[in-house]
Curated annotation (Swiss-Prot):
Reactions performed catalytically: a plastoquinone + NADH + (n+1) H(+)(in) = a plastoquinol + NAD(+) + n H(+)(out); a plastoquinone + NADPH + (n+1) H(+)(in) = a plastoquinol + NADP(+) + n H(+)(out)
Database matches in NCBIfam families: NDH_I_N, PRK02504.1
Organism superkingdom: Bacteria
TM regions (residue ranges): 16-36, 40-60, 80-100, 110-130, 133-153, 168-188, 212-232, 246-266, 280-300, 308-328, 336-356, 380-400, 402-422, 468-488
PANTHER family assigned to the protein according to its UniProt record, in alphabetical order: NADH DEHYDROGENASE (PTHR22773)
Protein name as annotated: NAD(P)H-quinone oxidoreductase subunit 2
Gene Ontology terms: cellular component: plasma membrane-derived thylakoid membrane
Annotated source species: Synechocystis sp. (strain ATCC 27184 / PCC 6803 / Kazusa)
Gene Ontology biological process: ATP synthesis coupled electron transport; photosynthesis, light reaction
């Protein structure tokens, strides 16, 4: 009995109960599809969404868990991981809502698509809480391989096949580099796999050989992370994959996959590389500069909506990295807050783009000319999301950027913040260009696509979930601007109550900062 109790205490399996619900949901989707076939196909999205919402509910109830460590230290269900896991699960909910009609129209299996998407969700959720090298890599591969499959899911579309091949080849190389970095950590720490134990062993790495090995490990690990978050110069896959992949997949990659990447970045860098904080701050400063400049400048010249949003996501990653480089409570909290609102405004934009694509079959920005005259509600929804991404007040994106810039300014990153402000203004131009094209064009200047714009039919199978997704993301984007302070307090609480971050801040001499919202006028 004592042995069983000891094993149960060490496993602490309750920490992965939200992921367990997702696993059960995944199995139910496959079993129900196998038994019911096409008769139950339309019920599967609702089954998956119900399971994901239950998982999010369990994440909420596990906030500030007394003992968040599970599976003998491999899983850390602290508040920081809870909020990132919730972001990933919610991004999957919206992705399912927007994908029902899209997948059905292509004639492919909806159940298989949902199953692969849930597998990617599991990988992202486990990655966000991974506290051990083996779990970090296995979770990353679960997310990556599922993403490759979703990217090439439209087998009859040559662009989807090309995107999947590019993503697979570059992603496999990135994973190999990342794994080599992890193997160096394992060797330098004397065979430890838990991040905390690795940090304890490496804190005294004072020999030349150990320091050089740790520097090489840092470079390789950052290369793997930078690929996942689409940071320049590891962004080459992003525009082509975004343009060729199914749009719902692009939406998930831009939010869920990116959130998982930033979650593992914080956990790995702050813990395992806590002894060389200055070094990785320098590297991420360079990545942030390159991402903000290239992402926002190249987006100006794009003619494809998905390709424009691909470069936009690269620029957005650069903004988030300012919070990471700040290395303070406010910096980490601003990262979490920005990912929370980015979830809704970016997925809202993709939901509107999917609706436009379903009606017209076009992805070209020029084809949006005059959309207001045929579909004012879609124009309003897409405009709100794009303006929020650009950081126009009083929308949510404005508060997200101002919190990140303020955190960077407090940490002395004056040049980085000023560059962020300049590139943010540049981004406003290409967002407003689309809005102006939709709204300002005279009726006689409408594109041929808009002139032949079909009437909407919400009674078609799969259209109602898309409608719910659009309305939900628009409402959330609008309310997030009004409720910015409570959301930021939530993000701050996730940082303040996370032992890993507090330990790192004490070691680097950072004093807990006052919440940004209190300093703003």
């Amino acid at each position: 009995m004592d042995f069983s109790s000891n094993v149960a205490a060490q496993l602490n399996a309750g920490t992965i109960l939200p992921e367990g619900i997702v696993i059960v949901t995944l199995l139910l989707v496959l079993i129900v599809d196998l038994i019911g076939g096409r008769k139950v196909a339309l019920a599967l999205p609702y089954l998956a969404i119900a399971g994901l919402l239950v998982s999010v509910g369990l994440l909420v109830t596990s906030w500030s868990m007394a003992d968040p460590i599970g599976f003998i230290g491999a899983f850390n269900g602290d508040n920081l991981s809870i909020i990132f896991r919730a972001i990933i699960a919610l991004s999957t909910v919206v992705t399912i809502l927007m994908s029902v009609r899209y997948v059905q129209q292509t004639g492919t299996s909806l159940a298989e698509f949902i199953a692969i998407l849930l597998t990617a969700t599991l990988g992202g959720m486990f990655l966000s809480a991974a506290n051990e090298l083996v779990m970090v890599f296995i979770s990353l591969e679960m997310l990556s391989i599922s993403s490759y499959l979703m990217t090439g899911y439209m087998k009859r579309d040559p662009r989807s096949n090309e995107a999947a091949l590019k993503y697979l080849l570059i992603g496999a190389s990135s994973s190999a580099i990342f794994l080599y970095g992890l193997s160096l950590l394992y060797g330098l720490s004397g065979g430890e796999t838990q991040l905390v134990l690795i940090a304890e062993k490496l804190v005294n790495a004072d020999t030349v050989g150990q320091s050089l090995g740790l520097a090489i490990a840092l470079v390789f690990v950052i290369a793997g992370i930078a690929f996942k978050i689409s940071a320049v110069p590891f962004h080459q896959w992003t525009p082509d994959v975004y343009e060729g992949s199914p749009t719902p997949v692009v939406a998930f990659l831009s939010v869920g996959s990116k959130a998982a990447g930033f979650a593992v970045a914080i956990r790995l860098l702050v813990t395992a590389f806590g002894g060389i904080t200055d070094e990785w701050h320098v590297i991420f400063t360079a990545l942030a500069v390159l991402s903000m400049v290239l992402g926002n400048v190249v987006a100006l010249a794009q003619t494809s909506m998905k390709r424009m949003l691909a470069y936009s996501s690269i620029g957005q990653a650069g903004f988030v990295m300012i919070g990471l480089v700040a290395g303070s409570e406010d910096g980490y909290a601003s990262m979490v807050f920005y990912m929370l609102i980015y979830l809704f405004m970016n997925l809202g934009a993709f939901s509107c783009i999917i609706l436009f694509t379903l009606r017209t079959g076009s992805d070209q920005i020029s084809d949006y000319a005059g959309l207001y005259h045929k579909d004012p509600l879609l124009t309003l929804g897409l405009s709100i999301c794009l303006l929020s991404l650009g950081g126009i007040p009083p929308l949510a994106g404005f508060f997200g950027k101002i919190y990140i810039f303020w955190a960077g300014w407090q940490s002395g990153l004056y040049g980085l913040v000023l560059l962020g402000l300049v590139t943010s203004v540049v981004s406003i131009y290409y967002y407003i260009r689309v809005v102006k094209m939709m709204v300002v064009k005279e009726p006689q200047e409408m594109s041929e696509v808009i002139k032949n714009y079909p009437a909407i039919k919400w009674n078609l199978p799969g259209m109602r979930p898309l409608q719910v997704g659009i309305v939900a993301t628009l409402v959330a984007t609008s309310l997030a601007g009004i409720l910015a302070n409570p959301l930021f307090n939530l993000a701050t609480d996730s940082v303040v109550s996370t032992k890993m971050l507090q330990t790192a801040l004490q070691q680097t001499g950072e004093t807990p900062a006052i919440a940004i919202s209190h300093d703003l006028p």
